[in-house]
Amino acid sequence: MNEPVEREEYRPSGTDLAPKLRDQEVGRTVVSARIPLSRAVLVAYAGASGDHNPIHWNERFARAVGLDDVIAHGMLSMGSVLARITEWAADPGAIVDCRTRFTAPVVVADAASGTPDTPTAYLDMAAVVGAIDEEAGTVRLDISVSSGEDTVLGRTQAKVRLA
C-alpha cells in the first residue's frame, strides 16, 4: 500500500506559518508571483476542465475567428492566481469569495523551440490587502494580473478567512 505523500507547499491552517489576521495591514503586498503558461499547460487544463474549445490549442482555428494566436482559458488564469492566494493562506478552504472580470486574452504562442512545455506567456500578479474585517475574520485582497503590457483580469478580489 502506498504511503501518503506530504506536499511541502501545504501548511494546515493554524500552523505558525499561516498568516494571522492580526498581522495584516491595508496596503501590504502579500503575494507577488510570475506564473508561466505553455501550450502543454493549456492542453492539460483542457483535459481537466473539459473545455476543449479549439481557440485554446489550435492556432489556425484561433486566427480564423479573429484572435492573434491560441489563448489561455480564462478560468485557468483565475485558478492559477487563486492557487497562489491559497498557498499564502496555508488553507485550501480559506478563500470564501472571489470575483474578477476577464479584460484581455492571454496569448500563448507556439514555442520557437517547438517544445510544447516551454512557457511563452506569463501572468504577473500581485495581491494587496485592501480591507480587513476583524469581526468576520477576513481580509479582502485586491489583485492585479497582467500579461505583458495588458491587464488580463480586472477588478479582481478575493476575500480570505484568516485565524
List each language-model region with its residue ranges:
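Catalytic strand-loop segment that frames the active site of acyl-thioester-processing enzymes
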Residues: E3-A72
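Generic structural detector for well-ordered beta-strands
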Residues: R34-S38, R101, K159-R161
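Glycine-rich loops and low-complexity Gly/Arg-rich segments
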Residues: H56-F61, I95-D97, A136, D150-V152
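HotDog/MaoC-like acyl-thioester-processing domains
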Residues: M1-V30, A112-A163
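Generic secondary-structure boundary signal with a strong preference for alpha-helix termini
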Residues: R39-A40, A62, M78, T86, ...
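Hydrophobic beta-strand-centered segment that forms part of the acyl-chain substrate-binding groove
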Residues: V65-D69, S77-A126
